[in-house]
Amino acid sequence: MMSRRLGFAVLLFAAQVGSAGATGLATCDSGPQSGWQSEDILRKQLTERGWQIRRVKIDGGCYEVYAIDDKGARVESYFHPVTLQHVMTSKR
């Protein structure tokens, strides 16, 4: 009986950790994707600011952007998909 409870606890923990996003750097409480702004709008806004976009993907419910910013730095930035508000940036 004890090993069954332990097994269940391990599965529950793994499910929670797995849903936190691949990197865990940022999470966005973004709701269903039907309410998100398009990736193309984000790309356009960042390009107009002088960014060179390399890749955009979804991670932790956020748009995760790999780019060269307007200062020439390689960055990994997260944006809320509903508001397109900047969440965080890390230099690469």
Positions of predicted regions on the chain:
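Short, non-transmembrane alpha-helical segments in secretory-pathway proteins
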Residues: 29-52
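A short, surface-exposed beta-strand/turn
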Residues: 75-87
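Classic N-terminal secretory signal peptides
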Residues: 1-22
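Conserved histidines in hydrophobic membrane contexts and catalytic metal-binding motifs
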Residues: 65-68, 79
